[in-house]
């Protein structure tokens, strides 16, 4: 909340000063304004995903004559998308290149920035809904139109090599591979791939009685299908079997599997590329948009197979029925999988650790959050107290 509004405030101040003539960057004025609008839109959009309401701040707001009003998250997202669209107009009307340290590691062109904004509009539209009905009601044709103009390669930043907490650093990537300490992969993510009865037995127990177990996964990202000399499972391409959990906490959170995909982030001390928007996410968004708009099963299957077959080692989804948004994640063709169930499983598997909050928002929109889970967060208490407003919260049973 505070970091995002700090970014919005800085971007807004920059636009105000350029428009007022207090600052002139010559031929680079449009580059600065376009980038500032991008920052405004990205930041407001994240606030709309996370919180139930927020402020909208841009260069048109006169703080000297009044105060900002909290407005519902949908209105915040509307403003965010308008800001991203305004950035796109500037990017497409001009031909410039950003300095490589504005988005660390690459000097992005104005055309590439327009693609980035289009992809974020598609991402934000899909993730905003708080339930299944709202997710189905998304204008998926607009999502598709933005995907058609969106990213054509993975997007992210280059880590600065300065370790944890540095400027160009992602805590999501850094901590997702900390399996040797506290980071474990939840069975609700990987369990659907279990070909033994371990996961179904685990689910059948009361949460207080659940404990960690060894799966027999058919997913090559989790296990390569062979055993080491000491009988442990040899690693998959993205995960591995690890030792027993030593934490003192509820055993339903224990797991014998760790996520190893981004280990180079920590082993290099943050000196590697950090991908924040994978091309596979564009494919998953396109697949879901086709599901909602009557697209062909073969086109959907082709998109899902890019990770399901190539990374997971599963058979093609070409013969599967469409299913519905009510289908639980399931990658197994031999166990009643549908295109919908594979989409849910694949998207959560492939994008694990890529962008903070992604799986939380997906489960919310698909109606799969655990009972009692809050659907969004309240405005932070510090701001409520400053404005003299009542504290409140969400969630619980």
Walk through the language-model features, giving the residues of each.
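Substrate-binding/catalytic groove segments of enzymes
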Residues: 94-96, 132, 310-318, 351-354
